[in-house]
């Protein structure tokens, strides 16, 4: 399980999280794969590309789990 720190930001959009963590090569790929139902947030399929991911949430994507921290 990987960790991603929001640092001083209150949230990050799901498609940006997938891009900056390297789980997707580009924002376009991230958006397409989210729309295809490949991303889960806290165990539920998430189809909103701009879903705000907050500290404490867990994102699952392509056999990877990312815990978002402050």
Where are these regions (language model features)?
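A detector for short, charged/polar N-terminal pre-domain segments
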Residues: 1-9
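Short, Lys/Arg- and Gly-enriched loop/turn segments at beta-strand edges
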Residues: 66-70
